[in-house]
Amino acid sequence: MEKFETVNGVAVPFRRSNVDTDQIIPAVFLKRVTKTGFDDALFHAWRQDPGFILNQEAYQGATVLIAGPDFGTGSSREHAVWALRDYGFRVVLSPRFADIFRGNSGKQGLLTGVISEEDAERLWGAIEAQPGITATVDLVAKTATVGEVQVSFDIDHYTRWRLLEGLDDIALTLRDEVRISEYEAARARWRPKTLPVKL
């Protein structure tokens, strides 16, 4: 997972609330366990509407999604995060996230920052005044800036640290590789052990 500090990219004013994971990626697309190839599945039903915001030219190549409250509710689907990342999003800002979606996001390198509903309105207004405008999201400062509008967002310290360091679950484990090896070497040989996977 790459380190996350600052993202500069097109922002989307996603004026929808209560967006569940089935709306983010319908269950019919959950047949694979790879992390890529899901960009076409993102918001699949809504993208059939030519007027849907992600179909508008100004928002092509967007990396920042400013959503309404209660984003990512419903079932736990890592695929929802994979679809957002595969489409190109690095950041989702919302007044409220489902806890399990937020947890899945941080582990996959998607920043989910909590903003107030008032700040969401301010960001939406700035984006809609200049469709295609670039947003700057600074994880170090915990700020999002669109034009003259700058807001602060909240993110838990642990997830913020993992994103700044670029640590997914495997990389986090590998930080302790020496200690793990020392433990395994000192452990009695007669005890059960896990054999390495041969690829």
UniProtKB/Swiss-Prot annotation:
Q: In which pathway is this protein known to take part?
A: Amino-acid biosynthesis; L-leucine biosynthesis; L-leucine from 3-methyl-2-oxobutanoate: step 2/4
Q: What is its EC number?
A: 4.2.1.33
GO biological process per UniProt: L-leucine biosynthetic process
Specify whether Amino-acid biosynthesis is a keyword of the entry. yes
What are this entry's molecular-function GO terms? 3-isopropylmalate dehydratase activity
Catalytic activity, per the record? (2R,3S)-3-isopropylmalate = (2S)-2-isopropylmalate
- Enzyme class name: lyase
Q: Which GO terms describe its cellular component?
A: 3-isopropylmalate dehydratase complex
Which keywords does this Swiss-Prot/TrEMBL entry list?
A: Amino-acid biosynthesis, Branched-chain amino acid biosynthesis, Leucine biosynthesis, Lyase
Q: InterPro entries of this UniProt entry?
A: 3-IsopropMal_deHydase_ssu (IPR004431), Aconitase/3IPM_dehydase_swvl (IPR015928), AconitaseA/IPMdHydase_ssu_swvl (IPR000573), IPMI_Swivel (IPR033940), LeuD (IPR050075)
* CDD domains listed in its UniProt record: IPMI_Swivel (cd01577)
Q: A Pfam family matched by this chain, by name?
A: Aconitase_C
Q: Does the keyword Amino-acid biosynthesis apply?
A: yes
**Signal peptide positions on this chain:** none
Q: What SUPFAM superfamilies does the record tag this protein with?
A: LeuD/IlvD-like
**What does the function comment of this entry state?**
Catalyzes the isomerization between 2-isopropylmalate and 3-isopropylmalate, via the formation of 2-isopropylmaleate.
How is the quaternary structure described?
A: Heterodimer of LeuC and LeuD.
Recorded family membership: Belongs to the LeuD family. LeuD type 1 subfamily.
Designated name of the protein: 3-isopropylmalate dehydratase small subunit
Output the lineage of the source organism. Bacteria, Bacillati, Actinomycetota, Actinomycetes, Micrococcales
